[in-house]
């Protein structure tokens, strides 16, 4: 019996020793693979990427005009190259022509929006007494209906409802009285020069970027070896394709939003359908806000004044636009920029949370830049766990 126990103990010890040796060999093997991966070059690349992300996190919020100008210049550069290739004119002339067309388009669009907004704002001010009358009438009808329902309710519940309604109205009245309308208007007017300066900086930076992009590219390539230059060429061509695909996809989604909004508003409010569809189309570019910021207050106002039909239709339209934006956008983006819908959605969300609204664009671009660098061999991730 003792001999059998000794044999079993020896067998267990041998098995445990064999298992420990296998685990040790596995750990050592994987350690060598990780050590081969973390070369000096790889470590410098990782440090550079981290420093770039940290710098972007602090610099991007205060340099949005310059970033927007650079992105716009990248978008307009193919038009400049095509014009220069077909007409055989100098690049300076081609840049001037494309820039002029772009500025004229922006100016005409801004003029149309401003005139329509002023016209509609004037009409709202002129009709404000009627709107106030409608709100008062709707409030009186609400009180009358509430009093009729009070008759069948317990006195304690009626008292609680009265207290709640009174407190709500008191809070609403105090919030309205606390708002200094003149101060808000003054603050808005005083901020206009700042916006104008930002817009001028954007236009000047756009023109200079369009002129200097080839020179900046040559300057960058002068610091690179031939092998690295080929990799960067592949990466930049891939990024150019992705940037164009991104804005093409965004434009396609916005066209769908504009068409659906215009068709819906032609049935709901035909007198302002075109203007409101255009405004909603512009605002829908902002991902965290979207069309709901226009349609929801409009619908609530219509419900308050008693126009339940119009208010309900506006809410339905807002829900339809939200569904279209959340379902169509990742698929279209993934098709045109080479990312899966899930990866596109994750990149957009993380970019939005880290960098704000501009991160909606930067998030997918960073993912594409990383995958392009990996495909070009600039970043090598060939280890397995």
Swiss-Prot record:
Family to which this protein belongs: Belongs to the autoinducer-2 exporter (AI-2E) (TC 2.A.86) family.
Transmembrane segments: 42-62, 63-83, 93-113, 191-211, 255-275, 276-296, 304-324, 350-370
Protein name (record): Putative transport protein BpOF4_00890
Compartments reported by the entry: Cell membrane
Record's bilayer topology term: Multi-pass membrane protein
Gene Ontology BP terms: transmembrane transport
GO CC, one annotated term: plasma membrane
PANTHER family in the record: TRANSMEMBRANE PROTEIN, TRANSPORT PROTEIN YTVI-RELATED
Keywords per UniProt: Cell membrane, Membrane, Transmembrane, Transmembrane helix, Transport
Main location, first listed in the record: membrane
Organism per entry: Alkalihalophilus pseudofirmus (strain ATCC BAA-2126 / JCM 17055 / OF4) (Bacillus pseudofirmus)
């Amino acid at each position: 019996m003792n001999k059998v126990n000794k044999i079993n103990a020896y067998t267990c010890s041998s098995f445990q020793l064999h298992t420990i040796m296998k685990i040790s060999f596995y750990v050592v093997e994987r350690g060598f693979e990780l050590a081969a991966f973390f070369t000096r070059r790889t470590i410098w690349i990782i440090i550079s990427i981290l420093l770039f992300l940290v710098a972007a996190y602090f610099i991007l919020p205060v340099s949005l005009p310059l970033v927007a100008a650079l992105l716009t210049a990248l978008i307009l550069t193919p038009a400049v190259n095509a014009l220069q290739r077909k007409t055989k004119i100098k690049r300076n002339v081609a840049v001037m022509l494309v820039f002029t067309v772009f500025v004229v388009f922006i100016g005409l669009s801004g003029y149309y929006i401003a005139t329509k907004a002023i016209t509609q704002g004037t009409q709202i001010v002129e009709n404000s007494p009627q709107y106030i009358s409608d709100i008062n009438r709707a409030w009186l009808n609400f009180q009358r209906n509430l009093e009729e329902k009070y008759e069948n309710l317990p006195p304690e519940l009626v008292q609680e409802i009265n207290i709640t309604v009174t407190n709500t109205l008191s809070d609403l009245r105090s919030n309205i009285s606390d708002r200094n309308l003149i101060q808000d208007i003054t603050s808005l007017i005083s901020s206009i020069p700042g916006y104008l300066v930002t817009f001028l900086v954007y236009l000047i930076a756009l023109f200079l970027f369009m002129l200097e992009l080839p020179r900046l590219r040559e300057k960058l390539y002068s610091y690179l070896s031939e092998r690295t230059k080929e990799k960067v060429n592949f990466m930049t061509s891939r990024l150019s394709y992705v940037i164009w695909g991104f804005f093409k996809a965004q434009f396609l989604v916005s066209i769908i939003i504009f068409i659906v909004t215009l068709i819906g508003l032609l049935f709901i409010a035909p007198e302002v359908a075109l203007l409101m569809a255009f405004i909603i189309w512009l605002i829908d570019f902002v991902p965290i806000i979207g069309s709901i910021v226009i349609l929801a207050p409009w619908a609530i106002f219509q419900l308050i004044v008693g126009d339940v039909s119009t208010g309900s239709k506006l809410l339905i339209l807002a829900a339809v636009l939200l569904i279209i934006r959340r379902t169509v956008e990742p698929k279209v983006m993934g098709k045109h920029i080479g990312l899966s819908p899930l990866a596109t959605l994750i990149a957009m969300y993380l970019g939005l949370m880290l960098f704000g609204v501009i991160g909606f664009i930067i998030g997918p671009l960073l993912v594409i830049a990383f995958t392009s660098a990996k495909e070009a061999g600039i970043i090598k991730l060939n280890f397995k766990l």
